[in-house]
């Protein structure tokens, strides 16, 4: 149980006290009207800059200022608060345990979201774990919903998330920060100059004695031990057109085990007890030609995960310990043909896998693709975009030749309103290690593929934004996990069958004035799978149906305070019970003590709910708080 060194009532009193202090003082924050543009520039959806109102896709944009004022713990936390996005985590804010990876889920399709950092794919083994991205490096997060296989290739089944890091520029400054709380503490430093940004931080987490909630009568009661994570990031402007990014994280001594469940080792029962060490590196060079219309990148993504089983007959590494890496190269050229635009490009990606226990288990996969996107402006009101991607995938089991088309239209009803249609196909290969250490036979897994159809309206007027989208997803060969083998207790990858989801999403944002702003969002869908090999094939719910978010912020002078809320309801039936609804309320308050000193109080899970972070029973943290002090030099 978490130690509550400071009671909720004391924290609320402290918050109210600071609320009184700020009256009549001078503001240091930037103008909220500049920080919260309702029609932001987007670079991911079309592979070129477009305003949100001119983008024929459903989008969510999270800015650096949004992250700061909402008090999001990390990138995962920021993304899962958006409408249409759920998540699978193994604890708080996307906690990983080895390759039990926290991941972002768009519109109910698990393991079908492509996550990138500055255009470099972060997915490994089809998981999009976000834990290694330093939150202090993030400038903007762009979320593009809908199948995006045409522009971005494999794994963009439900959509794409592009995390855009900060670029050097402006005056030189150094920020030092420290955080204390009843669960987390951290400290870090960031240097930002005209040509270079460097950040480094260290995070500590306390032990959580109860981390799972299972149906009544279960003997399983998991705990999570103390842990620490070290993060570092570099962003450099080598020239006006060439940028460099480097991100590093290692997490050591992250342990978990069971309080009362044990396995028999010889004649002795030992409680489950595991440790996970995790190291990640992501780096890349980007080129953005100012005058020639050429963009290019080369990138490298690496993860090494080592698990250690203390309860084995001979304690040692777990069989899933592995090295994963990928190399990416991409170059595109934009051709301006009068009012029309043609984008052509080539992409290369190589994925590598090597098991750390059984060294013979290694594999690699190489993908080569060419793509194009042609935008035809028929009139000032109507335009259409046709995209096509051809991809050759050299796979260790079965190679594939893929063709992914996409068709989009945009109709400008007037200067403040647009209507769009977006139809796209996506494709995803089984993980490169699917046949190692598992029961599935080579060739039995089929690639996932399918279509998304959506239409929507966007309206931006009088400091208000309204978005409405209706969508249908129709995919084949969804990959999931089998039931436990009665003899070995193991699960293995299988094609679960077809997937479908028809839904609607609505969002409203209002910047009332320079002090107040709020947003409301609601989504309803029906994500289902059907296993055609079952004795009685039928559609079965596969994720939550109801998704809602809300936020309200108040800024005046030196203080900004706000509430953010996320709800996921009518969740799926799994493991003999209905997964409970998830309800999370966060209160974040930031106060500028001086021009260079800031203090922030964040209270998470304010209602102290037992929130399932996945269908398996892993829990978010109970009510917890943290106080962060930042000094700028």
Give the label of every model feature segment.
Residues 211-212, 476, 570-572, 587-633:
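C-terminal beta-signal and adjacent terminal beta-strands/loops
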Residues 75-78, 100-105, 116, 128, ...:
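N-terminal periplasmic accessory domains that precede
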Residues 150, 170-171, 190-276:
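Periplasmic-side early beta-strands and strand-to-turn transitions of outer-membrane beta-barrels
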Residues 120-145:
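Short acidic/polar hinge/loop motifs at secondary-structure boundaries
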Residues 239, 339, 347, 361-475, ...:
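Structural signature of Gram-negative outer-membrane beta-barrels, strongest in the C-terminal barrel
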Residues 30, 180, 269-290, 322, ...:
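Outer-membrane beta-barrel signature, preferentially recognizing the C-terminal barrel domain
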Residues 76-120:
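Extracytoplasmic beta-strand/coil segments of soluble accessory domains associated
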């Amino acid at each position: 149980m978490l130690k509550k060194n400071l009671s909720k009532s004391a924290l609320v009193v402290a918050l109210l006290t600071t609320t009184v202090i700020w009256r009549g003082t001078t503001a240091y924050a930037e103008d909220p009207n500049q920080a919260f543009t309702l029609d932001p520039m987007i670079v991911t959806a079309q592979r070129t800059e477009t305003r949100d109102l001119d983008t024929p896709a459903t989008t969510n944009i999270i800015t650096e200022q949004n992250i700061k004022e909402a008090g999001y713990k990390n990138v995962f936390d920021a993304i899962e608060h958006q409408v249409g996005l759920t998540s699978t985590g193994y604890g708080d804010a996307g906690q990983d345990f080895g390759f039990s990876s926290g991941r972002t889920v768009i519109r109910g399709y698990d393991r079908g979201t492509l996550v990138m950092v500055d255009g470099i794919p972060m997915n490994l083994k089809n998981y999009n774990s976000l834990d290694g991205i330093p939150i202090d490096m993030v400038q903007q997060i762009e979320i593009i919903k809908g199948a995006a296989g045409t522009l971005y290739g494999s794994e963009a089944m439900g959509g794409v998330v592009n995390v855009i890091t900060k670029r050097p520029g402006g005056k030189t400054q150094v920020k030092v920060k420290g955080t204390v709380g009843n669960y987390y503490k951290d400290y870090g430093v960031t240097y930002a100059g005209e040509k270079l940004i460097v950040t480094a931080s260290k995070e500590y987490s306390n032990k959580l004695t109860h981390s799972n909630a299972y149906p009544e009568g279960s003997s399983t009661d998991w705990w999570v031990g103390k842990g620490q994570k070290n993060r570092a990031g570099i962003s450099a402007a080598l020239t006006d057109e060439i940028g460099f990014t480097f991100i590093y994280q290692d997490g050591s001594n992250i342990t978990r085990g069971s309080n009362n469940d044990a396995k028999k080792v010889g004649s002795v029962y030992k409680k489950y007890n595991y440790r996970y060490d995790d190291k990640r590196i992501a780096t890349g060079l980007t080129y953005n030609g100012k005058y020639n219309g050429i963009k290019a990148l080369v990138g490298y993504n690496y993860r090494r995960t080592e698990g250690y089983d203390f309860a084995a007959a001979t304690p040692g590494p777990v069989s899933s310990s592995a090295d994963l890496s990928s190399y990416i190269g991409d170059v595109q050229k934009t051709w301006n043909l009068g009012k029309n635009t043609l984008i052509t490009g080539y992409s290369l990606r190589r994925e590598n896998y090597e098991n750390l226990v059984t060294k013979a288990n290694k594999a690699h996969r190489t993908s080569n693709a060419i793509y194009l996107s042609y935008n035809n402006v028929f009139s000032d009101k109507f335009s259409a975009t046709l995209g096509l991607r051809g991809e050759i995938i050299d796979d260790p089991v079965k190679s594939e030749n893929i063709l992914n088309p996409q068709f989009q239209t945009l109709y400008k009803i007037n200067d403040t309103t647009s209507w769009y249609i977006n139809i796209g196909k996506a494709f995803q290969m089984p993980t490169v290690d699917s046949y190692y250490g598992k029961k599935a036979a080579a060739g039995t897994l089929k690639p996932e593929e399918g279509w998304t159809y959506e239409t929507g309206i966007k309206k931006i007027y009088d400091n208000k934004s309204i978005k409405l989208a209706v969508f249908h997803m129709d995919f084949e060969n969804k990959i999931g996990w089998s039931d436990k083998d009665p003899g070995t207790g193991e699960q293995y990858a299988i094609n679960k069958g077809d997937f479908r989801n028809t839904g609607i999403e609505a969002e409203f944002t209002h910047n009332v004035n320079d002090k107040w702003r709020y947003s409301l969002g609601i989504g309803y869908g029906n994500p289902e799978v059907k296993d055609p090999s079952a004795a009685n094939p039928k559609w079965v719910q596969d994720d939550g149906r109801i998704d809602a978010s809300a936020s309200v912020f108040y800024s005046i002078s030196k203080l900004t305070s706000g509430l953010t809320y996320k709800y996921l309801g009518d969740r799926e039936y799994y493991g003999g019970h209905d997964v409970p609804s998830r309800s999370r309320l966060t209160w974040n308050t930031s106060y500028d003590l001086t021009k260079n000193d800031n203090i922030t109080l964040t209270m998470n899970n304010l209602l102290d709910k037992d929130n399932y972070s996945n269908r398996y029973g892993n829990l978010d943290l109970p009510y917890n708080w943290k106080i962060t002090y930042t000094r700028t030099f």
